[in-house]
Amino acid sequence: MKTLIARHKAGEHIGICSVCSAHPLVIEAALAFDRNSTRKVLIEATSNQVNQFGGYTGMTPADFREFVFTIADKVGFARERIILGGDHLGPNCWQQENADAAMEKSVELVKAYVRAGFSKIHLDASMSCAGDPIPLAPETVAERAAVLCFAAESVATDCQREQLSYVIGTEVPVPGGEASAIQSVHITRVEDAANTLRTHQKAFIARGLAEALTRVIAIVVQPGVEFDHSNIIHYQPQEAQPLAQWIENTRMVYEAHSTDYQTRTAYWELVRDHFAILKVGPALTFALREAIFALAQIEQELIAPENRSGCLAVIEEVMFDEPQYWKKYYRTGFNDSLLDIRYSLSDRIRYYWPHSRIKNSVETMMVNLEGMEIPLGMISQYLPKQFERIQSGELSAIPHQLIMDKIYDVLRAYRYGCAE
């Protein structure tokens, strides 16, 4: 990461896409997409996804590392080209506890990530815990971030410290997109970004972390990009120019969250304006979902009723039976909920792919289609971009490859923006 940031600060148009997903097909696509390049691939886990207690994936940081490396070995992607990152590392998962208890767990969280070899650490102590004022004072956020940084430094080996990099910042959109409809978004003011940097510098130095400050590579700000279930707020470069100019006088770049669904031109403009780390998550699993839905429609037409997977019906049954991952985000009323479950840009369906019933139905669908010759006309109907690539000889009409290429469509836009 440090080399890439140095190149950006030297004037090169270069950025990196941060893949925030634990889905094996998304990770496989991210690695396979860059297998034949010289680029490194940044894959990040969030604190609620992966933590010392397992998170909602059931994986510790060490488990996640091995999970990613196993996929890399299968794909033929060199492990040393993978950068592992930890996102929102702090009391995010334990906000209902008092600050002392939550921070104690947060310290162990950060240590677990660093011990597991994660080298990009987002120190995010911005959330209020039980008994805390809302919002927290910037000084408190910075002091807690310094506690987390101290924890990281205390377990890092000398070799790890050479690679270790930190991201700071408190203006983080809701992970995975907004829960309610959005019309506009508040762009971070320069004075707030400067205050974030100033308070963190002061807190780090007070804890004897002056050297660790040199490892802070980025600050999280809101450049004016966001999405909810059916709306996207697109990047307006002119609105972010004060931020773009301010960061030029520092050693850092910006990290932009919730950049999903922007145009490829917007990604190029974001990187030009020093938002050099672009985080993406739901857009990748949304593309995966689109591919699976398309293949399910194809299966519906090609496979005899008694042999079909019933994939789409299984997904809906499971999500209505177990609504904990979408209920507080989506609209009420059966028809509205069904539309959101299927097509919401925030893609809460991503939490359900590991469910045994859904996983089995998708596997059945894939087996059903693997031995079939899918008519080109059907691929044109349901996967038109993939049809064009089949026509030009770039792609085969094999279900797994069709899913990969659908995810590649998202990664292609980021590659354009992060041009190297």
From Swiss-Prot:
Description of what induces expression: Constitutively expressed.
Xref: InterPro entries: Aldolase_TIM, GatZ/KbaZ-like, GatZ_KbaZ_carbometab, TagBP_ald_GatZ
Pathway(s): Carbohydrate metabolism; D-tagatose 6-phosphate degradation; D-glyceraldehyde 3-phosphate and glycerone phosphate from D-tagatose 6-phosphate: step 2/2
GO biological process: D-tagatose 6-phosphate catabolic process; galactitol metabolic process; phosphoenolpyruvate-dependent sugar phosphotransferase system
Top-level taxon in the UniProt lineage: Bacteria
Keywords: Galactitol metabolism
GO-annotated cellular components: plasma membrane
Family of this protein: Belongs to the GatZ/KbaZ family. GatZ subfamily.
Role, per record: Component of the tagatose-1,6-bisphosphate aldolase GatYZ that is required for full activity and stability of the Y subunit. Could have a chaperone-like function for the proper and stable folding of GatY. When expressed alone, GatZ does not show any aldolase activity. Is involved in the catabolism of galactitol.
NCBIfam families noted in UniProt: agaZ_gatZ, PRK15052.1
Name assigned to this protein: D-tagatose-1,6-bisphosphate aldolase subunit GatZ
Taxonomic classification: Bacteria, Pseudomonadati, Pseudomonadota, Gammaproteobacteria, Enterobacterales
